[in-house]
């Protein structure tokens, strides 16, 4: 699973996801992509599950680019522990995704397989997404 090798701080504030994506909103590498339509925190496990669904359906043909990275730690207190006595330990890693952000890009497969594969990947994510394709040049 994806997580940073080294971070400046162990724990992070919850924060809010405001606005729309300005960077990472267009296809940069592949011919087809999956674009987020709502703000959401996507965990490293969800990204990995979507990536596996994507590569399995493509039968390892073509190329996959993951355009988001889970760099925000989410802390959690153990079960049945009273409130107080500090913030919990880092439990998982999430990526803050804004609407309009391209999550996955693929290339080297035809339109039908790309659409099916990205639909399967979208089912693994907790977010509304849209299939995008590069205009034929």
Curated annotation (Swiss-Prot):
GO terms for molecular function: rRNA binding; structural constituent of ribosome; tRNA binding. PROSITE patterns: RIBOSOMAL_L16_1, RIBOSOMAL_L16_2. Signal peptide: none annotated. Pfam families: Ribosomal_L16 (PF00252). InterPro entries: Ribosomal_uL16, Ribosomal_uL16_bact-type, Ribosomal_uL16_CS, Ribosomal_uL16_dom, Ribosomal_uL16_sf. GO terms for biological process: translation. Keywords: Ribonucleoprotein, Ribosomal protein, RNA-binding, rRNA-binding, tRNA-binding. One of its GO terms (cellular component) is cytosolic large ribosomal subunit. Binds 23S rRNA and is also seen to make contacts with the A and possibly P site tRNAs. Part of the 50S ribosomal subunit. This is Large ribosomal subunit protein uL16.
């Amino acid at each position: 699973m994806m997580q940073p090798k080294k971070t400046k701080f162990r724990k992070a504030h919850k924060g809010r996801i405001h606005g729309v994506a300005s960077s990472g909103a267009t296809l940069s590498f592949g011919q087809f992509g999956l674009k987020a339509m709502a703000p959401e925190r996507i965990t490293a496990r969800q990204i990995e599950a979507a990536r596996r669904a994507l590569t399995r359906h493509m039968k390892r043909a073509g190329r996959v680019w993951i355009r988001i990275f889970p760099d925000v730690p989410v802390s959690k207190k153990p079960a049945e522990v009273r409130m107080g006595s500090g913030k919990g330990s880092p439990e998982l890693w999430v990526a803050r995704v804004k609407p309009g952000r391209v999550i996955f890009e693929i290339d080297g497969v035809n339109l039908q397989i790309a659409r099916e594969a990205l639909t399967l990947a979208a089912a693994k994510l907790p977010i509304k997404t849209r299939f995008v394709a590069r205009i034929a040049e």
